[in-house]
Amino acid sequence: HTEITNTYFNLKIKQTDFVLLKNSVLVKKYEFENKNNIELNVNFLVHSKLLTDYNNMVSGEVKNNTLIQYCHDYTMYTFSDKPFLSYQINNTKENISSGVIKDKDYIGMSCDSSISYDIGTLKPNEKKELTVYLYFKKSDETEEILNKELTEIKKLDVKKEEQTVEKYWK
């Protein structure tokens, strides 16, 4: 895992990444801890610029609280069991540094997308978690089957899955 402390806000972030053993899902678990003596209102932004090569166009959209990025025969789904606070497809590089992205429908090819989650207000010494899933999938299934798979992934016991992966690699 990786630990980062924002010294200005005194916010500690612990990131743990692992891949599920049974399918192509990258699990990114974040733990936020307020080391400050004041409450902190925390939002978490994810920026994705999917690019396989310069001649391979990518398109993005948001459906069912999932960022979907298409790239010819493959699709990447970015989601959590928590709802989005906001999202933006296209030109997110211009806004993301402000910490605010705007819900904006965009029709066209764009590899540049962002989503944000409301972690909420953290009291001093309080911890909260967010798990983000990245699911890489060959685009050969119906939407119904895919929605069922995404629902099952959201229901996973992340701690149990992490222990299973650790045990496998030891």
Model-derived features with residue positions:
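Short Pro-Gly-centered flexible turn/kink motifs
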Residues: 40, 120-140
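Polysaccharide-binding surfaces and accessory modules of carbohydrate-active proteins
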Residues: 3-5, 9-106, 113-116, 124, ...
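Short amphipathic alpha-helical segments enriched in leucine
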Residues: 133, 169-170
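Short conserved micro-motifs at the rims of enzyme active sites and ligand-binding pockets
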Residues: 141-145
